[in-house]
Amino acid sequence: MGLELLFQGNQLNRLLHGLWITAEIAFISVFFACFFGIILGVLMTSKNNIIKAITGFYLEFVRLIPLLVLLFLAYFGLAKWFDIHLDSVTVCILVFIFWGTAEMGDLVRGALTSIEKHQIESAYALGITPLQTFIYILLPQSLKRVTPSMINLFTRMIKTSSLAMLIGVVEVIKVGQQIIEHSLFTNQSAALWIYGVIFCLYFVICYPLSLFSRYLEARWEN
């Protein structure tokens, strides 16, 4: 059976270490993406045409350029054009932050603009300043509404992190490929079992997050 491959030597530990690299990339990226995304989302609601143009261009640029292209540009371009040499994990985290910030910013923008205007007008009528209105009324409600989507962004980052293998990151899928290639001639069913285990590992991480996101949505809707 192909499953026995996992218990030969340190194969299982290698897979789990690869999964840890995947989770580490996703966690660090989503943490900073949420922080910068909140700032970006606030800027995207600005009435200043220059700020709106810059943030709009950034969002469209990230959406139009495939993430894989951004990874290649950052990994090979920084070294060639600017003589900046970063390891593949660092490059992957930076690109994911760049991508995630745009996604999170758009989510925050949508949450801010979805808040009823009469709440803002009522706050002003009570003598609350615009800054206080934003901090105590708009921001808490927006973060509450955007939290399920933020969790979904985290799961997307976990799944999308498999692209990191193309710039040399030894994450869980890369480790799986190495095990399969090493065992290809001795066990032809190795790919089925190894990828099956990788699927289960992704499922164990992502499915609880998905359930938690649905729980929050259902609870806050009621």
Regions found by a protein language model. Give the residues of each.
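Transmembrane alpha-helices and adjacent helix-loop boundaries
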Residues: 1-222
